[in-house]
């Protein structure tokens, strides 16, 4: 009888040990899991960062996956040229070539009749003629005064390549494609022995109420703000400057009680577009009090200080910031490595090892 009880005890002890081991494994896994929230106003580059994670930390895009973006890219091209020609009357701009009046009409007719995501030869020809027109180019130069995709000139300048019969989108084409994020998109990948769960949340105002249940147990927030948006207005509200909206949103996040213990990293994104724009448009259009040099460095540092000065807990909470170009894989790789090191350092600090 005694030996029976002993065997039972041994079995219980064995099970208990297995359970302890399992709990320890789960705890170790949990400790190595980083929950990363990508936040920011609409069109600040969050989804492009997610695509870069696939390129850098997963296996990138297979030819089959690249092909799936073809229809999206064609849709972006059509939306872009339509946005430009529809803005011309509002801005009081005429076509330089009289023949383009007919081309504009033809474009509108074709846009209504073609299958979405396709690019028939007659449409390509009309877009090519319109894009060459001086009036269309003048309207494109004033893109901040209406809503236009950042990738418009990238695609329209390469119309022949992307409309060739054997066209297969490359990684840069995929990175520059634009689809509005609705809901929450999760991406999983591993870096430096850490398991990342990255959540990309729609940035438009209507999407933001979906963020709240993502807040639980967040390790790090990457907040994306578009540097180049300083002279632009929101898609949802043409009375609100995009940079002001971004600052307002950052203020509510960096000082939120939910994020008292969360690392916050600021990505001042679209530095390439900002570098071009700042040569032509003074920063005082957004910040009337700014009287510094209208150089990339000075204006960029001023914007950075506007964000960082919003942090009410500077004495205990450091906010890390980086100038980024989300379409530049090497830049994103370098910056994300730095972010990973910050997360490791903060984790060690929490454990009292730093």
From Swiss-Prot:
Which tissues and organs express this gene's product?
Retinal rod outer segment.
Q: Name one GO biological process term.
A: adenylate cyclase-modulating G protein-coupled receptor signaling pathway
Q: Where is this region: G4 motif?
A: 265-272
Q: Which SUPFAM superfamilies does the annotation name?
A: P-loop containing nucleoside triphosphate hydrolases (SSF52540), Transducin (alpha subunit), insertion domain (SSF47895)
Q: Positions of the region Disordered?
A: 1-27
The question of whether Secreted is a record keyword is answered with no
Covalently lipidated residues (N-myristoyl glycine) read: 2
Region (G1 motif), start-end ranges: 35-48
Q: Which UniProt keywords apply?
A: Cell projection, GTP-binding, Lipoprotein, Magnesium, Metal-binding, Myristate, Nucleotide-binding, Sensory transduction, Transducer, Vision
Q: Where does Mg(2+) bind?
A: 47, 181
Query: Where is the stretch described as G2 motif?
Result: 173-181
| Region entry G3 motif, spans | 196-205
Give the record's subunit note. G proteins are composed of 3 units; alpha, beta and gamma. The alpha chain contains the guanine nucleotide binding site.
Q: State the family it belongs to.
A: Belongs to the G-alpha family. G(i/o/t/z) subfamily.
Q: Per its record, how is this protein called by name?
A: Guanine nucleotide-binding protein G(t) subunit alpha-2
